[in-house]
Amino acid sequence: MYFVSNSESKFKELKQMAKNTKYDIQWYKYSIKELQTDNVEQLLRHKVLDAFRKLKRPVMVDHTILEVEAFNSLPGLQTNYFFRKMGNEEIVKFCNYKKEWKAKVVTKLCCCTGKKIIISDGFEEGRIVDNPNISNKGYDWDDIFKPAVDNDRDDVYSKLDKNSRSMRKKAWEDLIVKLSSEEIFFTHAEKYRENIEDLAELICKKKVMLFIGAGISASIGLPSWNKLIGELGEADDFDAEIFSEYGDNMLLAEYSETLNNNENRLQDMFTDKWDIKSNDILRSELEKSLIYKYIMELDCPVIYTTNFDHMIEDYYEMKKKEINRVAVIDDFDNSEQKHPRLMKFHGDMKYKDSIVFTESQYFKRMDYQSFMDIKLQADLLKYNVLFLGYSLSDINIKQLLYISRKRWADNGNKKISYIYTATPNYVQEKVFEKNGIISISGGVADKKIATELFLKDLCEQIKILKKRS
């Protein structure tokens, strides 16, 4: 379970509290913009849903509320902002002026299990000190708040053992009681390992072809599809976020080409940016990429990609390895190949007529009668598929799975396929499983690192199997 926060000290507290429980708390450093509201449940739901959208796995957030009698129970939900603006000394001065020192601190934990949102809390009642001794050891108010209970030495909060008595501890204890009866959508290490072993065995037998999407190119700094569309919009004097509100990506790409009366707009804007001969930064990122290294080490006989760029070909060339690129029918050679065959399923920047980027280009391809579609259908009868660099909601994945199911149904030769996604989706995983698609997700939140680890595990398992044989 990931604790999503900017605060490492809070994470360390929770990590220590969870030490003797079944929960392994990891830290994901991320700043969540807080909702301006006086409804604590609304604020917590906003924070935890923001975190869940980011990670797509069980997450936890917190929020601490200080209520000071002298301020009519403020700062309340806006405690962080309040302390940044006023500081401890000003708060103490005001309490002394009002002669009101009573205060209460509440910490709320909010967990998204992947299925439900669970909220817990813990609180301490006490008072604000009348003579501050600012140590800067604590969190905001820790140096000026004295708990009323179990505090014989009358210490401020920063001097107490938080792991034994804090509001966060009370909230954590409340939370694990509530979670005990809930289903939590964890990734399962045993299942991950089994899938790695099964997939490695198929790869060793040359029974797997790869399908590579935009996430692989994005790992070395090329834009994602959304970012690419945003850049097209900005080139047409739109704010990228406003441009995205006018339709899906293919429609927006169509608009950009129509507005500029230029069917080569994609090539004109990005050919030089995506050329490693003129882009030293991109070349450096590609050369040191572990993801491309492991893809090459898999040594699959066939690779399909919906990417327009040349990163796969360029990487093979850098490493002095041969690969046969097929973007148009003239590239295709029916003779037996000694090297991997790279099928540019949605075209190549080199051939403007081959690219599938706009809405009309996509619908033109929907008849599945091009040489590329026919070859794909033949390959689907021969190989299992491993999808890399796609999200489970990607339109390309849905199209490809439709083709796969149709071809397998027509021939009674259904093959298991695999998709690796750095961000899991429990609901779509179940739907895919029903259709013979096994979803594999790692336990690391960082997408690039997670993909590197998956491919590394796969390559290492392949080496083990080859040594045995």
Spell out what each predicted region is.
Residues 185-210, 216-218, 298, 319-322, ...:
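SIR2/sirtuin-family catalytic core signature
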Residues 8-9, 64, 308-309, 422-427:
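Short, polar loop motifs at secondary-structure junctions
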Residues 68-81, 222-225, 398-404:
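Short Gly/Thr/Asp-enriched flexible loops that form oxyanion-binding sites at enzyme active sites
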Residues 283-350:
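Active-site-adjacent alpha/beta core region of enzyme catalytic domains
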Residues 360-374, 400:
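Active-site glycine-rich loop that binds ribose-phosphate moieties when present
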